[in-house]
Amino acid sequence: MSAVRRAGELEITSPSNPRIKQVVALRRRREREQAAVTLVEGQAEIKLMLAAGGRPKALYYCAELTGPSGLFVADDASEHGAEVIRVTRPVFEKISYREGPDGLLAVVPALSADLDQIQLPVNALVLICAGLEKPGNLGAILRTADAAGVAAVIAADPVTDWGNPNVVRASKGTIFSVPVASASTDAVLAWAAKHELRIVAATPEASQILSDADLTGPLAIAVGAEQTGLSTAWLERAELRIRIPMFGLADSLNVSTSAAIITYEAVRQRLRVGELNQREWAR
């Protein structure tokens, strides 16, 4: 794809175009759910989404902003069935939802968030995010999950949806490489029991530090919102309660940081006992 408009390629030059208004409306959860789509912005994020098997319905690109590498991504999206639409800079700046846009935005089918569709491997490691409010934290946890080979990330009683553009952005596209689901606390607890997952609750009130806990075998690590922590339901059902040792004045860490520390302690232990080997982990 070149910077010159190709024959038959749709081009939109007006920010008031009805189609552009529809894209902007997808920032709202209700509109995304009704259309069963979400937005992915950014060259790196769209490349990862395509590599993970995502198939965009449409891709909007601005040649002035994206450069040659972005045009190759647009070509790749087109080869995978996406309608590619060229837009002017003012149009792209209207549909963009982040600072410093690089001229690529895709509309993709909504992710399945059905708990029953999650398939777990032997000795699965699962992350459960209970009542998390901030999309940025969910996205950051997805990046950790992808890097650590986590089997799934489950949102229990979610405040936001997986299709929130800020979740997608903070995940750097890894939301398309890690299975996700959403359900009520009761449903997630029942699902964990069905799959014989030991529940480990992360709480600053725990007496046991994470390095002293056995984090091998089928395991679900539960983290809660920073202000309220895990609910009584999680604390009562947890087989283990663990904390991260703190030596300063603060009594807790950002939830995504906590999730990363605990997850990598679990990975360390699994590598040590042979549940993972370096090659499998790196995949």
Show the residue positions of the predicted features.
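Boundary-proximal intrinsically disordered activation/regulatory segments immediately upstream
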Residues: 1-74, 159-161, 281-283
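Glycine- and other small-residue-rich loops at beta-strand/loop junctions that grip anionic moieties
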Residues: 12, 38, 130-131, 156-157, ...
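Short glycine-rich anion-binding loops that position phosphate/pyrophosphate groups of nucleotides
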Residues: 43, 64-66, 111, 204-207, ...
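RNA substrate-binding interface of SAM-dependent RNA methyltransferases
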Residues: 44, 51, 79, 85-90, ...
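Glycine/small-residue-rich loop that forms an oxyanion/phosphate-binding "nest" at active or ligand-binding sites
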Residues: 74-107
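Structured adenosyl-cofactor binding patch, chiefly the S-adenosyl-L-methionine
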Residues: 106, 144-148, 159-174, 232-283
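Active-site/ligand-binding-proximal alpha/beta "capping" segment
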Residues: 200-248, 254
